[in-house]
Curated annotation (Swiss-Prot):
Pfam families: AAA_22, Cdc6_C, Cdc6_lid. The lineage of its organism: Archaea, Methanobacteriati, Methanobacteriota, Stenosarchaea group, Halobacteria. Keywords: ATP-binding, DNA replication, Nucleotide-binding. GO terms for biological process: DNA replication. GO terms for molecular function: ATP binding; ATP hydrolysis activity. ATP binds at residues 60-64, 208, 220. CDD domains: Cdc6_C. Belongs to the CDC6/cdc18 family. It comes from Haloarcula marismortui (strain ATCC 43049 / DSM 3752 / JCM 8966 / VKM B-1809) (Halobacterium marismortui). PANTHER family: CELL DIVISION CONTROL PROTEIN 6-RELATED (PTHR10763), ORC1-TYPE DNA REPLICATION PROTEIN (PTHR10763:SF22). Involved in regulation of DNA replication. InterPro entries: AAA+_ATPase, AAA_22, Cdc6_C, Cdc6_lid, ORC1/CDC6, Orc1/Cdc6_arc, P-loop_NTPase, WH-like_DNA-bd_sf. NCBIfam families: orc1/cdc6 family replication initiation protein. This is ORC1-type DNA replication protein 7. Transmembrane segments: none annotated.
Length: 403
C-alpha cells in the first residue's frame, strides 16, 4: 500500500489558490482595467509610454491586473512592426534607495555573468550604465517597479528614468515607469518633480467588497477544488471575513486554502464553516508571530519589558511602568536605550500590529490623559517568539516562564 496518494476529495489544483498564481481573467476590476488600458494605449500607437502610478492596499489586484494587462499588451503589439516592446519587472521589497534600484535594474537587463557589484560605484555611474543597457535594448521599455514605496524618500530614480530621453541620456530607448505601491502616503511624500513625472497617470485600487470577493473565490474554486468539497456558505464566509477586515483577495484566498488544508489533515471530505474559523485563527496567529519577529531590536526590547509586566500581572501598564524595565533590559543586553518618547513609539507600533491593546485614560485636570497597554494576543504565543531572542538578556521572571 502506498504511503502517499493523490488528493481526490479536497484539492483538484491547489496551486490556483497560491499567491503566485496568475488567472487567465480578472474579476471585479473592470473600471481599473479600463483606466489602465487607456494609459497604455500610447504604446500601441508607437508613442512615448506614459508613466503610471498604481496604489492601494495589499491584495487588491494591482500586481495581478498589471501582469494580466502587460501580457496582453506584449501579445497585441507583436502585430505592429514599428512597436518593439520590452518589459522589466523589479520587486523593490528589499531595496531602500534609488542606487539599489538602479543596480538591480542593470543586473536584470544584463547576462548573469556580466552583472555589476551592488556597491562601489558612484550613483551617476550606475545610472549611466543603466542608460547604456536601455539604449542597447532599444524600442519601448516598460520598467515595472513593484512595492516601490520601500525606497522611501530616496526617489531620484523615479525622476531620472522618465526624463532620461528628454535629458539626452537615451537615443534608442523610450522608457516608461509603472510604480506599484501599497502605501497611500508614499505618493504624498514624493518630491514635487517626481510627483509630476511618475504620477502622469494614477490608478487607485480600492478594497474589494464581500460580493466581489465571493465572485473571485467562486472563479478560483471551480478549478482549485472538487465540486463537492466546498459549498456556497463556506465561500460566502471566507469573503465576508476578508471584506470586513482588509478587503484583500489574498486574505480571502488564504483563508479558503487554509480551510481546505485543515479539512484534508482531518481526513474530511468537505469544508465547513468551522474549518474557516479555525483557518482564520491560525492565519492571524502566524501573522502576529511574523510581525513580532520582524520588529527592530528596540521593538523586541519593548516587547520583552511588556511580557515581564504581564507575567508579573502588572498590566495594563503605563509608559512610566514599562520604560524602567525596558531600560534595564537594554543595558543588560549591551544596547543603548532610547529616550522615553522614542521607546513609546515602539509600544505604539506593537499596538498598531495588533500585538498590544492600547486604551486612553483621562483623569481630568489632576491626572491628565495617558495610554495603558496590555497584550491582545496569548502570552504563550509571545513567549514562543521571545524564546528565540538570543541577543537579549531576558529577565529571570520571563526566562523561567518560557523555558
Amino acid at each position: 500500500m502506498a504511503t502517499f496518494t493523490r488528493d481526490t476529495e479536497i484539492f483538484r489544483n491547489e496551486d490556483m489558490l497560491r499567491e503566485d498564481y496568475q488567472p487567465d481573467s480578472i474579476t471585479a476590476r473592470e473600471d481599473e482595467i479600463s483606466t489602465y488600458m487607456a494609459a497604455l494605449q500610447p504604446i500601441v500607437n508607437g508613442a512615448q509610454p506614459r508613466n503610471i502610478f498604481l496604489y492601494g492596499k495589499t491584495g487588491v489586484g494591482k500586481t495581478a491586473v498589471s501582469r494580466y494587462l502587460l501580457k496582453q499588451l506584449q501579445r497585441d503589439t507583436d502585430q505592429y512592426d514599428d512597436v518593439d516592446l520590452s518589459l522589466c519587472w523589479l520587486n523593490c521589497t528589499n531595496l531602500s534607495s534609488s542606487y539599489q534600484v538602479a543596480v538591480n535594474l542593470v543586473n536584470q537587463l544584463r547576462p548573469r555573468d556580466d552583472r555589476i557589484s551592488t556597491t562601489g560605484y558612484p550613483q551617476q555611474r550606475v545610472f549611466d550604465i543603466l542608460y547604456e543597457e536601455l539604449d542597447q535594448i532599444g524600442g519601448t521599455i516598460l520598467l515595472v517597479l513593484d512595492e516601490i514605496d520601500h525606497i522611501g524618500s530616496d526617489d531620484e530614480i523615479l525622476y531620472e528614468i522618465p526624463q532620461a530621453r528628454s535629458n539626452g541620456y537615451l537615443s534608442e530607448a523610450k522608457p516608461g515607469v509603472i510604480g506599484i505601491s501599497n502605501d497611500f502616503g508614499f505618493r504624498d511624500n514624493l518630491s514635487p518633480k517626481v510627483k509630476d513625472t511618475l504620477c502622469e497617470e494614477e490608478i487607485h485600487f480600492s478594497p474589494y467588497n464581500a460580493p466581489e470577493l465571493r465572485a473571485i473565490l467562486e472563479e478560483r474554486v471551480t478549478g482549485a477544488m472538487y465540486d463537492d468539497a466546498v459549498d456556497d456558505a463556506v465561500i460566502a464566509l471566507c469573503a465576508a471575513i476578508a471584506a470586513q477586515d482588509t478587503g484583500s483577495a489574498r486574505q480571502a484566498l488564504d483563508i479558503l486554502y487554509k480551510s481546505g488544508e485543515i479539512a484534508r489533515t482531518n481526513g474530511e471530505e468537505r469544508l465547513t464553516e468551522d474549518h474557516v474559523h479555525q483557518a482564520r485563527e491560525k492565519l492571524e496567529q502566524s501573522q502576529v508571530e511574523h510581525g513580532m519577529r520582524e520588529l527592530t531590536k528596540h521593538g523586541h526590547l519593548a516587547l520583552v519589558a511588556m511580557l515581564q509586566l504581564a507575567f508579573e500581572q502588572e498590566t495594563p501598564a503605563r509608559i512610566r511602568d514599562v520604560y524602567p524595565l525596558y531600560r534595564r533590559i537594554a543595558e543588560g543586553s549591551n544596547v543603548d536605550p532610547l529616550v522615553r518618547r522614542r521607546m513609546h513609539d515602539h509600544l505604539a507600533d506593537l499596538a498598531m500590529l495588533g500585538i498590544l491593546g492600547r486604551q486612553m485614560k483621562n483623569e481630568g485636570r489632576a491626572g491628565g490623559h495617558y495610554y495603558q497597554y496590555e497584550f491582545d494576543v496569548g502570552l504563550d504565543i509571545v513567549g514562543d517568539v521571545v524564546r528565540d531572542f538570543d541577543s537579549i538578556a531576558l529577565p529571570t521572571s520571563v526566562a523561567t516562564q518560557i523555558t
